[in-house]
Amino acid sequence: MSTSAASLHPFVYLASQSPRRQELLQQLGVRFELLLPRPDEDAEALEAELPGERAHAYVQRVCVAKAHAARARLVAGGHAARPILVADTTVTIDDAILGKPVDADDAFAMLTRLAGRDHEVLTAVAVVDAEGTLLPAALSVSKVRFAALHAEAIRRYVASGEPLGKAGAYGVQGRAAEFIGHIDGSYSGIMGLPLFESAALLRAARIDF
């Protein structure tokens, strides 16, 4: 049975500061408004790892925690009740979780570890519908193969500033593209928002696009 246009939501709240996620939503033709953490929120605390936590469990737990935090933010702020989209991305190699580097030295160490090897990029996506129900989250898993890299190439890339603020210390859509020999999975998932999974969740939440 088709859903009438009157029952569709005109936009979704995006609980993310990532420019890449905003670009990807625009690619789908999804209208959105940002729902960002308040100054008094400790958003970074949500991304803290638990002892012994594996990457797949970690990224899904953090995504769900972000979803609950975003819903609480919406209610506390008195915003109109609309669905909320959240996502979390991490990189994993050797069972280690590589999140956002804390500084240039950390970025250099991460990229040195990835050089010449395969790793996984995991992006979990969740939607809280307008009634406040968390829909089943989706997980995108992609494998990425990096070329062997000399230390000087890594230093030049780190000096560009691009690695900071990105899981695994690189952006697939930026200068790091020259390092990537092979991808098995979702390019948009590696960017931070897998469009196949996200579109399905947004349609389930009755977003008009």
Curated annotation (Swiss-Prot):
Q: What class of enzyme is it?
A: hydrolase
Question: What is one process in the GO biological process aspect for this record?
Answer: nucleotide metabolic process
Primary place of residence? cytoplasm
Write out the GO MF terms. Answer: dTTP diphosphatase activity; UTP diphosphatase activity
Site description Important for substrate specificity, residues in chain: R20, T89, Q173
Q: What is its EC number?
A: 3.6.1.9
This entry carries the following GO cellular component terms, namely: cytoplasm
Query: Where do the catalytic residues lie?
Result: D88
Look up the record and name the cofactor or cofactors this protein needs. Answer: a divalent metal cation
Q: List the disulfide bonds.
A: none
Domain of life of the organism encoding this protein: Bacteria
Task: Indicate yes or no for the key word Secreted.
Answer: no
Alphabetized UniProt keyword annotations:
Cytoplasm, Hydrolase, Nucleotide metabolism
Compartments where located: Cytoplasm
Which catalytic reaction applies to this protein? dTTP + H2O = dTMP + diphosphate + H(+); UTP + H2O = UMP + diphosphate + H(+)
Q: Name one Pfam family in it.
A: Maf
Instruction: Please give the function described in this protein's UniProt entry.
Output: Nucleoside triphosphate pyrophosphatase that hydrolyzes dTTP and UTP. May have a dual role in cell division arrest and in preventing the incorporation of modified nucleotides into cellular nucleic acids.
Q: Which family does it belong to?
A: Belongs to the Maf family. YhdE subfamily.
Identify this protein by name. dTTP/UTP pyrophosphatase
Q: Which organism is it from?
A: Paraburkholderia xenovorans (strain LB400)
